[in-house]
Amino acid sequence: MIELLVQARKDAGLTQVELGKRLGQRQTFVSKVELGERRLDVAEFVAVSRAIGIDPHAIIRTAEADTH
């Protein structure tokens, strides 16, 4: 799912710094999430999705479809 969030961020034209600002976090938070060094809890996943401008349910549906 993280790969989908990274691609969505890039498609939205957002840098890690810009996404971090939207979340009230530093760029290092975004980097660690994207590198798999830090996991997101459900609330953080929803916040990141919304900050990128995508529906969190759409990310989940896409991830589920990719595994089947």
Where are these regions (language model features)?
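Short basic helix-loop element that most often maps to the first helix and adjoining turn
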Residues: 3-22
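Short, charged recognition helix plus adjacent turn
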Residues: 50, 58-68
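Short, basic-rich loop-to-helix N-cap that marks the start of a DNA-contacting helix
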Residues: 37-47
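Key DNA-contact positions within bacterial/archaeal DNA-binding proteins
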Residues: 17, 28, 38, 57
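The DNA-recognition helices of helix-turn-helix-type DNA-binding domains
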Residues: 26, 37, 63-67
